[in-house]
Structures are given as structure tokens and as C-alpha cells.
UniProtKB/Swiss-Prot annotation:
Gene encoding the protein: SWT21
Main location: nucleus
Cross-referenced Gene3D superfamilies: YVTN repeat-like/Quinoprotein amine dehydrogenase (2.130.10.10)
The protein's name: Protein SWT21
Organism from which the protein derives: Saccharomyces cerevisiae (strain YJM789) (Baker's yeast)
GO cellular component terms attached to this protein's record: nucleus
Length: 357
């Protein structure tokens, strides 16, 4: 039986003129945004990639420089068309999106057994540092232009029974809002732990451990003002909200009309500066919680302090995309230059749509 092609993630360029999609067919595709004025019609048309290349093995993790653009003429920055890709039994590698050539391989070899460690999560920050997460809650930090890690830490604690001590994700900040580093970085694990990564210290600091039936943290999203953290977990039907100053206690939850199953297509949430938090559904629609609610930690801005605490918040809107309702909308991300325009993965195809379309 032929394996279905599914989009694993989408990355917009910082100027909104192009974006990149990564798929489970080992392919990495780059798209140009059409210059048509009536982009409302684009959700009925398939987009054709401007460039594409394929690796010879599956892609476990990947990340693009936050300053990625096709039109970067500043030659003293190692940015532009670069993507870092992690796989099994292979080093983390930096590729050119234009020609698919490997530019640099990072040293991810385990010195004890001589094998390459699988990079399960990776992130590039605004200062060109590459963060990697692997087994036993190991985090390493690289300068993007150098193969050897400049900082490394591995947890000595064992995960509880049935849990995996793997760093599964790093904190994601909204595009189009922040351009500066917010200091220490959060990361999550499949053992439902949340850590703080700060290269000024010698070790990871565990800030949160949740005893829940959920199957591990898969995303950590930050509000545009940086005050609230939204945590997505596998085997869960809610998104947890925390105050960044107190990550020990759940503040509110966003209620999902479905459960994020361990073996289902990846459904990714996303926060942008204009529309708040959005997430695709198994039915091909898009759920949304508005910016005001997201920036206030799940409490609508019109609520007074005397109002009771909201504990489970349903979506404020649900948008239909005029696409096949039997195929999940796995990834949805807004264009930084035009927040009403978003790239949507629908199975293995990529579309451009307008919110509310």
C-alpha cells in the first residue's frame, strides 16, 4: 500500500514572498507567492514548487533561519536560503534550499558508542544559534557556521515508566512581531517536562513536570507579548496555558473538539501577531482563538477582574477552506507580510487561502 504524503511543517520567509514545506516523502519544497491580486481564488488551485530536492532518508526535524528570504543580498550573513535537517543515523546538516546541496554537517556523534544521535527537535534563533534536542533530554547549542557544539547538557534524571526522556520541541515565537531574543529558551519533552535552556548556566533547569495521561509535549508557543506560554500535548484534547512567570500551575486551557492522537497526522498550532492562535482540524477546517484572548492568557480583554476564572475555552471561530473535508488540515501558518493570507497543508498538497474563506 502506497504511503500517503503528508506535510510535516511550513516555514514562511521573513518578507512573506516565499515559503518552504517539508514532507514525509523526504522532500523539501520552496514556493513563491503568486503576484495575483485576487488570492481568494488560490485555495482552489494547487501550488507548484519553485525549487525542490529530496534527501535519501526521512526527516525527523528541521528548522529555517528566522531571517530566511530569497532576496537576501547581505553576504556577511549565513542566512538566506538555508535549512537545517536532522535524521536517524545521520549528522545534523545545513542545506541550501536553492540547489539542495549540503553546506555543513554538525558533530552530533555520541562519543561513547560512535553513533550519530538522532536530533528530534531543532531551532535556529535570531542570533544564528542552532539548538538541538535528543535522547536523555540532551540539548546542544551550535554556532550555525561551525560544526562543533559550543554548549551541551544532558539530564541525569530518568523518565517515569512509560515516558520518553527526549527533547521533543523548542519554544516557538510569533513571526512578524518579535525580532529580538527574549533571553532563555523553553523546551519540552515527551515525558511532559518543560525545561529552560540558558547557555550562561551549566545545566538545564526543569520548570514544569505534569503528571497527565497526555503522551508528551509536542509544541510550546509563546504569545506576542512573551507573557504566556501555550503547550500542545499528544493524546490530549486541550492546549494548556501558563503564565511564563509561573510555569508550575496551569492558568487556563483551550478546548479542542478532537484529540491529538499519537499516530495521527501532525496537527500543528500557530500563533501570529494579527489573528492569535490557529490550528487545523481532522475535518479540514481551521480553529482560531483571537489575538486579544491569546495575549491575555486565555482571558478575553473585555472581562473584568471580578469575572470567574475561565478554565476551558472553546474556539472563538472556525473557518472553512472550501477543500475536501475528509483530509486533515495539518499545518496552517500566516504570511508575515499579509496576515490574512495563510499557507495551508491539506494532506500532501499546499494551498494559499484567506482567513474566513
Amino acid at each position: 500500500m502506497e504511503k500517503k504524503v503528508i506535510c510535516q511543517d511550513i516555514f514562511w520567509s521573513c518578507d512573506g514572498t516565499s515559503f518552504v514545506s517539508v514532507h514525509n516523502d523526504f522532500g523539501i519544497r520552496q514556493y513563491l507567492v503568486p503576484e495575483e491580486s485576487n488570492t481568494d481564488k488560490l485555495n482552489r488551485n494547487l501550488l507548484l514548487p519553485f525549487t525542490r530536492f529530496f534527501r535519501n532518508q526521512s526527516i525527523v526535524s528541521c528548522a529555517i533561519d528566522p531571517f530566511y528570504t530569497l532576496y537576501n543580498e547581505n553576504s556577511d550573513r549565513l542566512a538566506g536560503d538555508r535549512i537545517v535537517v536532522g535524521g536517524k543515523n545521520f549528522p545534523l546538516q545545513l542545506y541550501s534550499l536553492m540547489d539542495g546541496q549540503c553546506i555543513l554537517s554538525y558533530d552530533t556523534m555520541n562519543k561513547i558508542n560512535g553513533e550519530y544521535e538522532t536530533v528530534y527537535s531543532v531551532k535556529i534563533d535570531v542570533e544564528s544559534r542552532v539548538y538541538t534536542g535528543s535522547c536523555r533530554n540532551k540539548v546542544a547549542i551550535y554556532d550555525k557556521s561551525r560544526r562543533d557544539a559550543v554548549w551541551m547538557n544532558q539530564s541525569t534524571k530518568k523518565a517515569s515508566k512509560g515516558r520518553q526522556s527526549i527533547i521533543s520541541c523548542f519554544e516557538e515565537q510569533p513571526m512578524g512581531g518579535q525580532a529580538l531574543s527574549r533571553g532563555s529558551l523553553l523546551c519540552g519533552s515527551y515525558a511532559n517536562e518543560m525545561f529552560q535552556v540558558d547557555c550562561r548556566h551549566q545545566r538545564l533547569e526543569r520548570l514544569n513536570y505534569t503528571r497527565t495521561v497526555a503522551g508528551g509535549i509536542v509544541q510550546i508557543l509563546t504569545s506576542d507579548n512573551g507573557r504566556y506560554v501555550y503547550v500542545v500535548r499528544r493524546n490530549s484534547d486541550a492546549i494548556s496555558i501558563y503564565d511564563r512567570r509561573n510555569l508550575q500551575h496551569e492558568l487556563n486551557v483551550l478546548r479542542l473538539p478532537f484529540r491529538i492522537h499519537h499516530n495521527s497526522a501532525k496537527l500543528k498550532a500557530y500563533i501570529d501577531t494579527a489573528y492569535g492562535l490557529s490550528m487545523g482540524t481532522p475535518q479540514g477546517t481551521i480553529l482560531n482563538w483571537g489575538r486579544d484572548l491569546v495575549e491575555f492568557g486565555g482571558v478575553p480583554s473585555h472581562n473584568s477582574v471580578e469575572d470567574p476564572l475561565i478554565t476551558s475555552i472553546p474556539p472563538e471561530s472556525e473557518w472553512r477552506t472550501n477543500l475536501d473535508s475528509t483530509i486533515p488540515a495539518t499545518v496552517v501558518k500566516n504570511c508575515p507580510g499579509d496576515p490574512e493570507l495563510f499557507a495551508l497543508s491539506h494532506g500532501g498538497t499546499i494551498s494559499l487561502c484567506r482567513f474566513g474563506g
